[in-house]
Regions:
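Structural motif
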Residues: 11-13
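Long, compositionally biased intrinsically disordered regions
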Residues: 155-207
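Two-metal-ion RNase H-like nuclease active-site motif
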Residues: 1-6
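Mg2+-dependent endonuclease catalytic cores in nucleic-acid-processing enzymes, primarily RNase H-like
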Residues: 21-175
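Beta-propeller blade repeat segments, especially FG-GAP/WD-type strand-to-loop junctions
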Residues: 15-17
Length: 207
């Protein structure tokens, strides 16, 4: 499960991953809240307890959650994740450097918003967003069910697909030549894509 934190809501996308990293979108939810109020973060706890039902009847629970900490509510996100690391709730931040691994070594963030040292600070994981997006968009091109194929529910709104495909890989001039970067279309929203990137990170954490 990937979580993107916005000013007035949590955007959440849950994926199931099978053999060969075949993927199924299980749920897309928008949870309206005030992320500045740490009490509202309990809404994510309620969501994490959701039990989804496989078509075979088997119950499926959320195995891991990655929460974006790069927005306006960094320390609230740190605090939430720090208290739940043993429950596989990961504090993450995107790293757009090319060729950056989806999962890199974590750094410990042990200073709170007031500059005070926190005992047992939160581990912050940097996610190679360009690499993850390469992987996601590559899978969207797989046409037959099986390894790498992506399944979607018929109940997903049009906005879901618009956000998932809101970025394009375009050439940009850099020192020494040209490089490709993932760029969001002007005025577009990409929360679903960000959540999916963080969900892919979770699969790497779970091995």
């Amino acid at each position: 499960t990937g979580v993107d934190v916005q000013d007035n809501r949590f955007e959440v996308v849950t994926w199931a991953v099978g053999r060969g990293e075949e993927m199924w979108c299980i749920d897309y939810s928008v949870i309206y809240a005030n992320p500045a109020d740490e009490r509202d973060w309990s809404l994510l706890d309620a969501y994490r307890k959701t039990i989804f039902q496989h078509e075979s009847g088997q119950a499926m629970k959320i195995e891991a959650m990655a929460v974006d900490t790069g927005g306006h509510f960094t320390h609230q996100a740190y605090n939430y994740c720090r208290q739940r690391e043993r429950e596989r709730v990961f504090a993450v931040r995107g790293d757009p450097q090319p060729s950056k691994m989806v999962k890199s070594k974590a750094t410990v963030q042990d200073v709170n918003w007031g500059g005070k040292i926190i005992k047992k600070g939160v581990r912050l994981w940097y996610v190679g967003t360009d690499t993850a997006k390469d992987l996601i968009y590559g899978r969207l091109c797989v046409e037959k069910p099986g390894a790498g194929y992506v399944h979607f529910s018929k109940d997903l709104p049009h906005e879901f697909y618009t956000q998932l495909t809101a970025e394009a890989r375009v050439p940009q001039r850099v020192a020494g030549g040209e490089a490709y970067r993932w760029i969001k279309a002007p005025g577009a929203r990409n929360e679903v894509l960000d959540c999916t990137v963080y969900a892919v990170f979770c699969t790497h954490m779970l091995g």
